[in-house]
Amino acid sequence: MSIMQVEVVSGEQKIYSGEATFIVVPTVQGELGIYPRHEPIMSLVRPGALRLTVPGEDKEVLVAVSGGILEVQPDKVTVLADVAVRSAEMDRARAEEAKKAAEAGISQAKDDKALAEAHKALAAAIAQLKTLDYIRSHKK
């Protein structure tokens, strides 16, 4: 079985560091599926669910990413995410409340910095909601 090293890092912390046999990353071009020995590429990450197939695990490892940069090398994938949260740490009610607060922050922003922070918070909330929707739609 071929494996690759995967690093998912946000500004706050390392979210995942380990091996994977397959990874799906939400990019601005669409969802990108990556197997070991993939051609080198770089892409912008869009808000959504990053999915990892990990050796020895029967369930995918899910991480909500709000944006960032993806770098793929034949034996390593690195995702530098603006914000990243593991699925186990997510809560739908909190994510929906965060989305409402971010939308209010966008409409009430008094300067560019406040507007940028509100957009970042909105992207993080949307990423969590998309990940939670993926989990709900794939429950058995």
From Swiss-Prot:
InterPro entries given in the database record: ATP_F1_dsu/esu_C_sf, ATP_synth_F1_dsu/esu, ATP_synth_F1_dsu/esu_N, ATP_synth_F1_esu_C, ATPsynth_dsu/esu_N
Compartment list: Cell inner membrane
Main location, first listed in the record: membrane
Listed GO CC annotations: plasma membrane; proton-transporting ATP synthase complex
Alphabetized UniProt keyword annotations: ATP synthesis, Cell inner membrane, Cell membrane, CF(1), Hydrogen ion transport, Ion transport, Membrane, Transport
GO molecular function: ATP binding; proton-transporting ATP synthase activity, rotational mechanism
Annotated membrane topology: Peripheral membrane protein
Source superkingdom: Bacteria
Family recorded in the similarity comment: Belongs to the ATPase epsilon chain family.
Subunit description: F-type ATPases have 2 components, CF(1) - the catalytic core - and CF(0) - the membrane proton channel. CF(1) has five subunits: alpha(3), beta(3), gamma(1), delta(1), epsilon(1). CF(0) has three main subunits: a, b and c.
HAMAP family cross-referenced by the UniProt entry: ATP_synth_epsil_bac
Function statement: Produces ATP from ADP in the presence of a proton gradient across the membrane.
Protein name: ATP synthase epsilon chain
Species assigned in the record: Neisseria gonorrhoeae (strain ATCC 700825 / FA 1090)
Higher taxonomy: Bacteria, Pseudomonadati, Pseudomonadota, Betaproteobacteria, Neisseriales
